[in-house]
Amino acid sequence: MQTFAEISALREQIKTFKREGRRIAFVPTMGNLHEGHLTLVRKAREHADIVVVSIFVNPMQFDRADDLNNYPRTLEDDLSKLNGEAVELVFTPTPEMIYPEGLDKQTLVEVPGLSTMLEGASRPGHFRGVATVVTKLFNIVQPDVACFGEKDFQQLAIIRKMTTDLAMDIEIIGVPTVREMDGLAMSSRNGLLTIDERQRAPVLARTMRWISSAIRGGRDDFASIIEDASDQLRAAGLHPDEIFIRDARTLQVVNAESTQAVILMSAFLGKARLIDNQVVELVKDSKEEVDSAESESENSH
């Protein structure tokens, strides 16, 4: 396994592999790797000869300084895990390398619509930061395929559209969420939880499953479902951030044409902001316009 901090050195090595006809897969991460990340690496291995993993805590996508400062950084442990997966190349740039003129003078990439709705509405600039850094990393690595977790459902939709809109010749592969034994979605932020908080955290997934069951049972009173779900989270000591029920394909309000809905949830627990999602098939009676859906976020606080 080779580790590169310099863009030019990484590019030269990738060019060598490409001249040899090797297929390149890329897994961008922010480090503090867990089994979910390693699942992405294994999926990447299925689609390419060479796997490149980046470890970069991107300051542009954080809307709170404390969140950026608290984000766990475990480089030595990360490199050990990647070595165990026989990753060929690891890219570990500094913010100064990625943004040499600073954030204020950086050319920005933003996917209209998708970037400013749902989570993007409450975290202005977040998805612009994601799209910008992923574009830069794609340009540096020049992969044939890139793997992203489905846990970040809206982010994956944005990256898919960005790749299509900018005519990037990169196959985007979504990988299902990896969960702990108790159902909690694996996340680097889980390490911020205290022992007591960790015991309460699976309530997010359980509440999501309750919402899914309600929808599959034919309920279409989404505002009431969201209110009940928020109460369940509060009762367990979580602070609801956002709960949305949207069309899984468009992320717009569910309507008569919708065949699947996606439940998008986030909640604060201690220092951690936990997120999760689940796609659910809609029964016929649920495929109608839900006028109250636009106020879901506000109702979930």
From Swiss-Prot:
Q: Which Pfam families match?
A: Pantoate_ligase
Q: What sections of the protein cross the membrane?
A: none
Q: Name one GO molecular function term.
A: pantoate-beta-alanine ligase activity
Primary localisation category: cytoplasm
The protein's annotated catalytic reaction(s) are: (R)-pantoate + beta-alanine + ATP = (R)-pantothenate + AMP + diphosphate + H(+)
Which residues of the sequence carry a binding annotation for ATP?
30-37, 149-152, 178, 186-189
Q: Which residues bind (R)-pantoate?
A: Q61, Q155
Q: For beta-alanine, which residues are the binding ones?
A: Q61
What are its E.C. numbers?
Answer: 6.3.2.1
What GO biological process, any one, is recorded here? pantothenate biosynthetic process
What is the top-level taxon of the source organism? Answer: Bacteria
Instruction: Tell me the pathway.
Output: Cofactor biosynthesis; (R)-pantothenate biosynthesis; (R)-pantothenate from (R)-pantoate and beta-alanine: step 1/1
Presence of the UniProt keyword Membrane in the record: no
Question: Localized where?
Answer: Cytoplasm
What are the record keywords, sorted?
ATP-binding, Cytoplasm, Ligase, Nucleotide-binding, Pantothenate biosynthesis
Q: Which GO terms describe its cellular component?
A: cytosol
Please state what class of enzyme this protein is.
ligase
Active site at which residues? H37
Keyword Ligase applies: yes
Give the free-text miscellaneous remark of the entry: The reaction proceeds by a bi uni uni bi ping pong mechanism.
Subunit structure, as described in the record: Homodimer.
What family is this protein classified in? Belongs to the pantothenate synthetase family.
Which NCBIfam families does the annotation name?
A: cyt_tran_rel, panC
Outline what the protein does.
Answer: Catalyzes the condensation of pantoate with beta-alanine in an ATP-dependent reaction via a pantoyl-adenylate intermediate.
Query: Which protein, by its recorded name, is this?
Result: Pantothenate synthetase
Query: Which species is this UniProt entry from?
Result: Vibrio vulnificus (strain CMCP6)
